Regions:
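Active-site neighborhood of HAD-like aspartate-dependent phosphohydrolases
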Residues: 1-3, 7-56, 66
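Short N-terminal helix-initiation segments at or just after the protein's N-terminus
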Residues: 1, 15-28, 75-81, 108-115, ...
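Conserved acidic, metal-coordinating active-site core of Asp-based
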Residues: 114-184
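Charge-dense, low-complexity intrinsically disordered segments
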Residues: 31-35, 105, 141, 171
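A short local loop/turn or secondary-structure capping micro-motif enriched for an aromatic residue
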Residues: 21-22, 96, 179
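Active-site phosphate-binding/coordination module
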Residues: 37-123
């Protein structure tokens, strides 16, 4: 038996979210405590890990994922970069990654067009990044408006826009957590 779970806003929460006083820090970034886990979630995960495998599935990059320490030991498998990167004992599994690159090939032109459009967005508050050659990421004050503009202007067929607060992603349709779980 395996328990697949997202991390952010499912198991862990940023300092911006109030989750009560019974919590523990699970991520430090640039000397600041930035992500937390409730004590109850910690207890449940600790018990669960003794019984079955747990596989985190996240849009986080490998670097961002490695900053997290839930306090229950490392996981044998994790899916990062929205399922585009499989980690086995903390290391990227190269065959999986190469297959992910093949899968997103049909989206490359749309990603390039989207990057050019994102560069011109005036309320962007962060650089436009191509994450692991798989998808785009940036931050905008009005990410939902920017996502709608991208969809209307580019008529995306092979990629989707996703928003989470000020975060904006342009992700190939074939690169999603559900499909990654099927691959695994």
């Amino acid at each position: 038996n395996i328990f697949y779970t997202d991390l952010d806003n499912t198991l862990i929460y940023s300092y911006k979210h109030e989750i009560g006083k019974a919590k523990r820090c699970v991520e430090i970034y640039q000397g600041r405590e930035v992500s937390f886990l409730t004590e109850k979630t910690y207890q449940l995960l600790s018990e669960l890990k003794k019984r079955i495998g747990i596989v985190p599935v996240t849009t986080r990059t490998m670097e961002q994922y490695h900053r997290i320490d839930l306090g229950i030991g490392k996981f044998r498998y994790a899916l990062t970069c929205n399922g585009g990167v499989l980690l086995v004992n903390g290391e990227r599994e190269q065959t999986w990654y190469e297959k992910s690159l093949e899968m997103v090939e049909s989206s490359k032109t749309e990603l390039q067009q989207a990057a050019r459009c994102l560069e011109r967005i005036k309320d962007r508050t962060f650089e436009v990044r191509l994450i692991e050659e798989l998808f785009l990421f940036t931050k905008c004050r009005h990410s939902q408006i920017a996502a709608r503009q991208l969809q209307e202007n580019l008529q995306l067929r092979f990629a989707d826009t996703l928003t989470n607060g000020e975060k904006l992603y342009v992700v190939p349709k074939v690169l999603n957590k559900g499909m990654a779980l099927q691959r695994l």
